Amino acid sequence: MASPGILEESSSGDVCSGGCPDQWEEKTEEELQCQFEQAAKHVQNVASVASTEQLLYLYARYKQVKVGRCNTPKPGFFDYEGKKKWEAWKALGDYSHQQAMTEYIETVKKLDPDWSPQALEEPYKEPKTTFGGPVVSCLYKVQETLREEDKDIFDYCRENNHSRVSHALSTGSVDVNVADDEGRSLLHWACDRGHTQLVSVILFHNAHINMQDSEGQTPLHYASACEFPDIVDLLLDHGADPSLVDNDGFQPHEVTDSKTIAAMLQQHASNGEHNKPPSLLLEMPQ
């Protein structure tokens, strides 16, 4: 979400929060666009003094200008930075193009009071930007493309590579409950990425369904937070415990924004169904 401090400043008149039509009328669309592009370029110079919340504030407005209303799915549970950026952009809703540019420019000015954009008639070259604008590089970590020989079982799990994972588990070359450095199992990863069929494969090989990572979160926490109802239902059907809490004291129904999933989990917990033995037969997915 955007920084409360920034939003408070916006309402003070220094940065528009509800719209500043008079200010927009003082600049032509071309002038505003030119100043916005210069501000986007200058962000690279002030990123080191900006807080994470200020960068998120800028990121959201950059995306609103370049793309418009948020039109991408919510990132997975593991992608914390991606989720924060998505939430900041999503919160803008139908924010106008002009309002987003104006607030972006004014915020950059606040970060560097000595900076001012060039007038339109002065020479100006549009900056080369990375995906999402320069500010993205301050928040977004691009995953390296691994060579096939460098991949491990977790990479295959993230890629939803059924054959590789199934073969490794079937031959016993990999323990189904193996964990990464953060205590996350293959089941955690499959649930985070929404790989329903792969979840079934892993459960077939008797994965510890209530295994907790270093944060105390179970695969059910992950599926709930990432809003995959089919996987939540699958986990519950095979004995996942919806009453387990993570290190912050949250149960799975408390980490999701989905009312449907929250209701499903609470209903399951109230019925005590997680105390029943899991299904005796789980067919291997084709």
Swiss-Prot record:
Q: Which UniProt keywords apply?
A: ANK repeat, Cytoplasm, Lipid-binding, Nucleus, Repeat
Q: Where are the ANK repeats?
A: 182-211, 215-244
Name the major location.
cytoplasm
* Pfam families associated with the record: ACBP, Ank_2
In which compartments does the protein localize? Cytoplasm; Nucleus
**Binding of an acyl-CoA: at which residues?**
Y59, A60, R61, Y62, K63, K85, Y104
Q: Which PANTHER family match?
A: ACYL-COA-BINDING DOMAIN-CONTAINING PROTEIN 6
Its biological purpose is as follows:
Binds long-chain acyl-coenzyme A molecules with a strong preference for unsaturated C18:1-CoA. Does not bind fatty acids. Plays a role in protein N-myristoylation.
What protein am I looking at? Answer: Acyl-CoA-binding domain-containing protein 6
What is the scientific name of the source organism?
Xenopus laevis (African clawed frog)
Quote the gene name from the UniProt entry: acbd6
